[in-house]
Amino acid sequence: MFILLVLVTGVSAFTTPTVVHTGKVSESPITSEKPTVHGDNCQFRGREFKSELRLEGEPVVLRCPLAPHSDISSSSHSFLTWSKLDSSQLIPRDEPRMWVKGNILWILPAVQQDSGTYICTFRNASHCEQMSVELKVFKNTEASLPHVSYLQISALSTTGLLVCPDLKEFISSNADGKIQWYKGAILLDKGNKEFLSAGDPTRLLISNTSMDDAGYYRCVMTFTYNGQEYNITRNIELRVKGTTTEPIPVIISPLETIPASLGSRLIVPCKVFLGTGTSSNTIVWWLANSTFISAAYPRGRVTEGLHHQYSENDENYVEVSLIFDPVTREDLHTDFKCVASNPRSSQSLHTTVKEVSSTFSWSIALAPLSLIILVVGAIWMRRRCKRRAGKTYGLTKLRTDNQDFPSSPN
Amino acid sequence: MEICWGPYSHLISLLLILLFHSEAACRPSGKRPCKMQAFRIWDTNQKTFYLRNNQLIAGYLQGPNIKLEEKIDMVPIDLHSVFLGIHGGKLCLSCAKSGDDIKLQLEEVNITDLSKNKEEDKRFTFIRSEKGPTTSFESAACPGWFLCTTLEADRPVSLTNTPEEPLIVTKFYFQEDQ
């Protein structure tokens, strides 16, 4: 089963899409070579994740995910059939509005009762597979907009682009189809200076996007079949992204060289200016010879401090310190770099540690100082103990004298 | 003799405790900030990413389908190098070589376990370059190969070494995931 899955994926990945410009859609459906009972000995592959969300009265195509880009009809030993979940009938037999061409089920036009789960069955000499596709047909009213709209985003003060999506089958079947763009109910014709044609009618350019350009747009394609015209509508919700949200970070400190004494403790803050915006996703970190600090110093002699974000006079800063404990000779030959990065930009600043011999270092002085204190303390304590010991010695002498006196009369 | 030593040994102990306490205070506590960021990504043709059969696809999502959109997790390595993943960094994008064939893969690797210094993790590294508001990603393990989508919708996200090809899109927009 896994090999088969890989095979299907591989076929899907390597299939080259062919551009077919047929004048009209063939009316005759592909009849199955033998009578089939759907679900019989077929491996069910699951549901296609994307639901098809369309408007009533419009043409709809359902594409079978099992062979999404290959033309099934060209293969002489395989075929594909469609059925609806609540019906045992194959699709072409009982509904003139539906037919199958290749791996695509056409519904023209769709009505709300067409909503439901459709099952495509792919069968060849060696195996049989099934997948389901969900279709929801909505009323063509404003209330349906949230359910059918495509989300697209443009940046403020740039040339925005809107794309009329998912028209591939209709364009290839009807190359001369006209596409009209609307904002709300307003037709955006060629006379409109703010909206430009991109040449390709499926695209709309918005010159110098502003916040007012946000909202619902519609592209409507006219599709002709058997002499009758149908509308194919795609609704798009455009959101305008403010470019000022993310500032370009500016690294203010440290200096290019940092004076330090060997053996001393050293804290080097990297201070980054974030402008006056409300929030930022800027992250700041240190590197030693282009290596993360935690990876370069696993024992923790050099560590990175906490991410500290604060404001001064309505200006935003973030600070991350590099902490040496202690500085060693190795650090004099290491390239330390602070990096500030956010979706908009990355900045970096190099710095090196330079030895300063004249600087008095408390941590160096602390060790011998402690030793001196201990020694002096010990001497002082010994002197006090010696005095008491002296007294004790005197008492002993007196006893000895007493002992000598009785022995002399003998 | 005991009376003589008692009070001074206490003083010595106190001094030692103070020294150690001072030492302990030098080391900062608290966890290191995570460098992984989640972004919404879309190409310059307004296509977003979603998964189908464990493959990353670029297409147009509408209505409730929008919840299928895959956010990109990015971990910066160096000034212009990044690791890219989805699903909170549990699946990582990588460049796979098999003979002369170059393919984009999704590997089940935790993005926080990757390291720039390991040679075997180089296939996960992408060189990020900005041109105006758009960003492109070149594989570090396969130089000259760029992350791309096709102009046509619902096709796999892949790698290309012909970024100027008109039917190929190699430029992307980003927005922090709010």
Swiss-Prot record, chain A:
Keywords, sorted A to Z: Cell membrane, Disulfide bond, Glycoprotein, Immunoglobulin domain, Membrane, Receptor, Repeat, Secreted, Signal, Transmembrane, Transmembrane helix
Single annotated GO MF: interleukin-1 binding
Gene Ontology CC, one term: cytoplasm
Name recorded for this polypeptide: Interleukin-1 receptor type 2
Subunit structure comment from the entry: Associates with IL1RAP to form a non-signaling interleukin-1 receptor complex.
Organism classification: Eukaryota, Metazoa, Chordata, Craniata, Vertebrata
Pfam families for the chain: ig
Gene3D superfamilies, alphabetized: Immunoglobulins
Transmembrane parts of this sequence: 356-381
Bilayer disposition of the protein: Single-pass type I membrane protein
Domain Ig-like C2-type: 35-136, 146-237, 249-357
Post-translational modifications reported in the UniProt record: A soluble form (sIL1R2) can also be produced by proteolytic cleavage at the cell surface (shedding) involving a metalloproteinase.
Disulphide bonds in the chain: C42-C128, C64-C120, C164-C219, C270-C338
Gene expressing this chain: Il1r2
Topological domains, Extracellular: 14-355
Topological region Cytoplasmic: 382-410
Swiss-Prot record, chain B:
Glycosylation sites: N110
SUPFAM superfamilies named in the record: Cytokine (SSF50353)
Keywords from the named record: Cytoplasm, Disulfide bond, Glycoprotein, Secreted, Signal
N-terminal signal peptide: 1-26
InterPro entries: IL-1_CS, IL-1_fam, IL-1RA/IL-36, IL1/FGF
Pfam families reported for this sequence: IL1
Recorded phenotype for the gene knockout or disruption: Deficient mice still possess other negative regulators of IL1 activity and adapt to excessive IL1 via shedding of IL1R1.
GO term, biological process aspect, one: response to glucocorticoid
PANTHER family in UniProt: INTERLEUKIN-1 FAMILY MEMBER (PTHR10078), INTERLEUKIN-1 RECEPTOR ANTAGONIST PROTEIN (PTHR10078:SF28)
Protein name: Interleukin-1 receptor antagonist protein
The species this protein was found in: Mus musculus
Gene name as annotated: Il1rn
